[in-house]
């Protein structure tokens, strides 16, 4: 097998982990593309991306065009004469002329089993929708949004304890291995591309802070999924006592209740039970404004009067 000459394009830490795997592999990373340095910290000094820093540590040339629609940037990329371009969380749109420049085109590492979740938030939407598994897809890029042919897929069971943060970490380990395996398969001519089934495709919309507000009229199971999906950002929350209270951990209770949605059923060291549109949700870990996350037991030590059974959350008229 002849090692491939690879251009790598990426920006955040997730991408840097994939670059490290390529550096450690038998393939040759001949250039790295990354977003422009951004002001960071109190001094607003320009901060290089994790991908750029890793490239410089390994003496790999770094390119930071503001756009790849620019003819000069396109000519510069073409002059590198790469076999393939690997794109992981880069942040710039690749026009068709760039996708067609490397001999084997451009491939992408996507954080879901395509075509299940295309778009910006596949990890979060898998949790949000109650999927039992996720994974990584290595995909041949085309001009569509995550619509290209699939080259290699991995699978990862979603555990009840998983949050978006934990799945991100697991996929950040799976992705680099899958990427190197795919490149080696392409170099050997052993990978067969598979078309995506459009009928199975969903768009994973970006998350918003507004979406993370807990709606007690939803089922306990759906609220539990949302709390996990929105951790570490934007964190599920509800308004109570003129405060926005974040919920970092919860589970679906075995308790039953006929109380209106949002009613506190019980409050003790085991958790705060809330009636929902279907079932009961137990809150386990919360965060009051300006405070660090605490177990419900610790919060009740100082704020028990906020969570008296019978109180209705998100209600203008709370129980006496």
Swiss-Prot record:
The UniProt record gives the binding positions of (6S)-5,6,7,8-tetrahydrofolate as 112-115
Q: Which UniProt keywords apply?
A: Protein biosynthesis, Transferase
Tell me the superkingdom of the source.
Answer: Bacteria
Q: Name one Pfam family in it.
A: Formyl_trans_C
Please give the function described in this protein's UniProt entry. Answer: Attaches a formyl group to the free amino group of methionyl-tRNA(fMet). The formyl group appears to play a dual role in the initiator identity of N-formylmethionyl-tRNA by promoting its recognition by IF2 and preventing the misappropriation of this tRNA by the elongation apparatus.
EC numbers, comma separated: 2.1.2.9
For this entry, the protein name equals Methionyl-tRNA formyltransferase
Question: Which PROSITE patterns has this protein been placed in?
Answer: GART
**Catalyzed chemical reaction(s):** L-methionyl-tRNA(fMet) + (6R)-10-formyltetrahydrofolate = N-formyl-L-methionyl-tRNA(fMet) + (6S)-5,6,7,8-tetrahydrofolate + H(+)
Instruction: Give GO MF terms, alphabetically.
Output: methionyl-tRNA formyltransferase activity
A Gene Ontology cellular component where this protein is annotated is: cytosol
Coiled coil region boundaries: none
Q: Which HAMAP family match?
A: Formyl_trans
Q: Which NCBIfam families match?
A: fmt (TIGR00460)
Of which family is this protein a member?
Belongs to the Fmt family.
